[in-house]
């Protein structure tokens, strides 16, 4: 891809000129946006340039609070609806519903499952979490204790095959 070639070019120029090397790249990455895997992940792994992912919960969609098109009063989607067009795509709700079913099937918190999936990627250096409330922060931090089984990963990857990157 263009981004992976560009990243590779930057890395090569840094080496050619003995400049300090790039250590990380900050990109969005979530169950709804795995586009980093197309080209950039390979360069990240090969050149040891870690990804610092932001929006692992897709602005709250992967917490489950916006399921079925409902936007709780005072939520960012209710408050700033016109700003968040990235997530209003044809397959967003379908993918979210499938991820929700996986989390329930395996007795996982949907937010924690989503964050942990990001964290476990080989190219990932760190996952930048955010929270509006202390309860959300505690839930997100607790994701470090979550273990995703091979079955969970397989089911997550199957959703990606059916609804690839609904919110790039």
Regions found by a protein language model. Name each.
Residues 35-38, 62-69, 140:
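Short, well-ordered secondary-structure micro-motifs
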Residues 1-11:
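Single conserved hydrophobic/aromatic residue that forms the stacking wall/gate
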Residues 56, 87-145:
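Conserved short secondary-structure transition element at the edge of the structured enzyme core
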Residues 21-26, 48-52, 125-128:
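Structural preference for beta-strand elements that scaffold enzyme active sites
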Residues 25, 44, 51-54, 99, ...:
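Conserved, mostly hydrophobic/aromatic
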Residues 20, 43-102, 164:
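Glycine-rich, positively charged active-site loop/lid region within alpha/beta enzyme cores that binds
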Residues 14-21, 105-107, 147-148:
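Short helix-capping segments at alpha-helix termini
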Residues 29-33, 55-62, 117, 133:
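Glycine-rich beta-alpha junction loops
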């Amino acid at each position: 891809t263009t981004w992976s070639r560009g990243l590779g070019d930057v890395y090569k120029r840094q080496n050619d000129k003995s400049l300090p090397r790039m250590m990380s790249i900050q990109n969005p990455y979530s169950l709804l946006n795995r586009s980093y895997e197309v080209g950039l992940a390979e360069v990240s792994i090969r050149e040891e340039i870690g990804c610092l992912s932001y929006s692992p919960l897709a602005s709250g969609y992967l917490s489950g609070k916006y399921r079925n098109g409902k936007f709780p009063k005072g939520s960012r989607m209710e408050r700033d609806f016109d700003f968040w067009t990235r997530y209003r795509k044809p397959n967003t709700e379908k993918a979210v519903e499938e991820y929700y079913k996986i989390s329930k099937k395996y007795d996982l918190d949907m937010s924690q499952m989503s964050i942990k999936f990001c964290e476990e990627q080989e190219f990932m250096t760190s996952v930048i979490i955010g929270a509006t409330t202390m309860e959300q922060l505690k839930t997100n931090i607790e994701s470090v204790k979550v273990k995703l089984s091979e079955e969970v990963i397989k089911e997550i990857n199957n959703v990606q095959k059916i609804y690839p990157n609904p919110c790039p």
